[in-house]
């Protein structure tokens, strides 16, 4: 009987680790959301919705201080997210800086943006107007898809 108790205790170790891992996954999910709302917010005059999304995201952000406990990880998660829409990356960084009450977010976005500029200078130099518009048009379905695939992943994770 005792041995089974100990086995249960030992089994709980990886479970708690798994929980932490799940939070990590959730953090990644939130970064996806942020990337999406930012690519939309690059032209806020088109629709007021992105600002709402950003506000929602920031509220979630404050509820989950867990994400910032490991700073290097959000950095890694944020890099690919910013890499995809590189024309809007600069706008994303400034948007975050203006709206975010947490300066950490802005700092991380800025760092990522610096790295991004160093990695892909030609793409940043290209006139940002037309790519931003095309980005806007294809960002809508992509946003839906991203959010849906992410939430299903989360569900799988929790089940």
Swiss-Prot record:
The keyword DNA-binding applies. GO terms for biological process: segmentation. Residues 18-34 have a biased composition (Basic residues). One of its GO terms (cellular component) is nucleus. Its main location: nucleus. Residues 140-159 have a biased composition (Basic and acidic residues). The keyword Nucleus applies. GO terms for molecular function: DNA binding; zinc ion binding. Residues 18-49, 119-159 are annotated as: Disordered. It is found in: Nucleus. Keywords: Developmental protein, DNA-binding, Gap protein, Metal-binding, Nucleus, Repeat, Zinc, Zinc-finger. Belongs to the hunchback C2H2-type zinc-finger protein family. Gap class segmentation protein that controls development of head structures. This is Protein hunchback. It comes from Drosophila soonae (Fruit fly).
